[in-house]
């Protein structure tokens, strides 16, 4: 390889002035040489291509970030129809519904969990969730909706059920309300997990002919995949939401673009730790795909990287 080819891009200092915009700052990240800053720039450029192209954009994420202010970022992406498909976990329903009606509170990682238990406060990282802001309010809101839906028909697909929950919540702060409003399907492969999952189980125990047909969700996903000209994905964290996203994309020879934000490492062979490079071997990401792995806290990186698109 020609030495000059390796030395054609000098490292430039970041220079911030009072009028510097976030997109200008991210542009400077791209010329700064290292380390995660350059990856944030690469992710921004890939996401810009996703949003500007005629392609189907997937957004996958775990539930924990919905307990934080990052919920507002996800909600804006949905509200502005910048994403076409959401794949997440059942806790997203829990936190989205609960926070529509009750507050969560800023806490700390370092506190006596035994004391919190005695006080009726649950800790999610450094977010404090009072008992009254979680299980009871979810039951209070979800069970009457299930009663209504059951009277309408006995069997629902998962994504249709989520739309119906969002429709009845009818609150602009809610992700699932805006997903319903914009007809963006929300897929939850692990539908029976979490508090809303427990409500579904409880309702089933009282109404044994009630059904959630998750294979209808898979049918809907297959239609989306096979109709897509191109696909891109913004994947936050790993687990089932990431895997279901890349799993379905293997049936069209892989994603065309992908941005993966994670703190997990690949040494243990986990799906969460697996780099996008590994997904190429499984045909879940295309060989010629444009992609980047960004290591860091999604509650910092995601708002920064998508802020220019939300102005």
UniProtKB/Swiss-Prot annotation:
Domain of life the protein comes from? Archaea
Enzyme Commission numbers on file: 2.5.1.46
* GO cellular component terms given for this protein: cytoplasm
Q: Which InterPro entries did the record assign?
A: Deoxyhypus_synthase_arc, Deoxyhypusine_synthase, Deoxyhypusine_synthase_sf, DHS-like_NAD/FAD-binding_dom
Give the positions the UniProt entry annotates as the active site: 284 (nucleophile)
Keywords linked to the UniProt accession: Hypusine biosynthesis, NAD, Transferase
Cite the annotated pathway: Protein modification; eIF5A hypusination
**SUPFAM superfamilies associated with the record:** DHS-like NAD/FAD-binding domain
The cofactor(s) it depends on are: NAD(+)
GO MF terms, alphabetically ordered: deoxyhypusine synthase activity
PANTHER family reported in the protein's UniProt record: DEOXYHYPUSINE SYNTHASE
The record's comment on protein family reads: Belongs to the deoxyhypusine synthase family.
Task: Quote the protein name from its UniProt record.
Answer: Probable deoxyhypusine synthase
This chain's source organism reads Picrophilus torridus (strain ATCC 700027 / DSM 9790 / JCM 10055 / NBRC 100828 / KAW 2/3)
The taxonomic lineage of its organism, from the top, reads:
Archaea, Methanobacteriati, Thermoplasmatota, Thermoplasmata, Thermoplasmatales
């Amino acid at each position: 390889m020609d030495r000059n080819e390796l030395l054609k891009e000098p490292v430039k200092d970041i220079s911030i002035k009072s009028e510097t915009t976030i997109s200008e700052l991210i542009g400077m990240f791209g010329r700064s040489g290292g380390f995660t800053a350059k990856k944030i720039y690469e992710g921004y450029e890939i996401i810009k291509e996703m949003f500007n192209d005629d392609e189907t954009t997937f957004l996958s994420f775990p539930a924990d970030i919905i307990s934080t202010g990052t919920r507002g970022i996800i909600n804006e992406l949905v509200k502005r129809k910048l994403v076409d498909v959401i794949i997440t976990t059942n806790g997203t329903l829990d936190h989205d519904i609960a926070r529509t009606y009750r507050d969560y509170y800023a806490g700390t990682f370092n506190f006596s969990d035994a004391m919190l238990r005695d006080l009726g406060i649950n800790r999610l990282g450094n977010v404090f969730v009072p008992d009254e802001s979680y299980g009871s309010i979810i039951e209070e809101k979800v069970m009457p909706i299930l009663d209504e839906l059951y009277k309408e028909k006995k069997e629902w697909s998962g994504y249709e059920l989520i739309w119906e929950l969002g429709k009845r919540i009818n609150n602009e702060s809610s992700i699932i309300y805006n997903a319903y409003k914009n007809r963006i399907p929300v897929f939850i492969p692990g539908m029976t997990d979490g508090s809303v999952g427990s409500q579904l189980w409880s309702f089933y125990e009282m109404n044994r002919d009630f059904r959630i047909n998750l294979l209808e969700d898979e049918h809907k996903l297959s239609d989306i995949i096979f109709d897509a000209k191109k696909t891109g994905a913004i994947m936050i964290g790993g687990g089932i939401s990431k895997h279901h996203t890349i799993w379905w994309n293997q049936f069209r020879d892989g994603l065309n673009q992908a941005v993966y934000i994670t703190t997990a490492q690949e040494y243990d062979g986990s799906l969460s730790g697996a780099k996008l490079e590994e997904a190429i071997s499984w045909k879940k990401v295309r060989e010629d795909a444009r992609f980047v792995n960004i290591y860091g806290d999604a509650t910092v990186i995601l708002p920064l990287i998508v802020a220019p698109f939300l102005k």
